[in-house]
Amino acid sequence: MTRPDIPQEFKDYARRLLGAERYARFAQALDEDPSVSVRLNPFKAVWSGLLAEDLNGVDGSVPWASGEGCYLSERPPFTFDPLFHAGAYYVQEAASMFLGQILRRYVTRPVVALDLCAAPGGKSTHIRSCLPEGSLLVSNEPVKWRE
């Protein structure tokens, strides 16, 4: 049974689109608690010892995040962590960390990049950490309430 706040029309559409077996896996995933992942900031001095000493509950690395992403076994109260406020790491969905693989592979010289939907900023900080030295990133958020 999927979450009750999902409209029945969407459930029916997804079942037709995915087929019975895939829909069952999809519905099960919707009932599970979401995973928690963080991306370490490679430009911070504390980064090298961060995983071992300061982040509790590390539950594996994000395979496509070049050693910068990890899953946590539970969601800690990030707002109480001074390393979070210092920018040592960013709470970021693991799937969005895949962008780093693309940038590191195909962007090999300095570029000017534009992030048109930049709030709350996780992908912008990730993009900047992956661009070659000498690159410029302009981050923009056109939707006022997302700033």
Feature roles, as predicted:
Residues 1-147:
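S-adenosylmethionine
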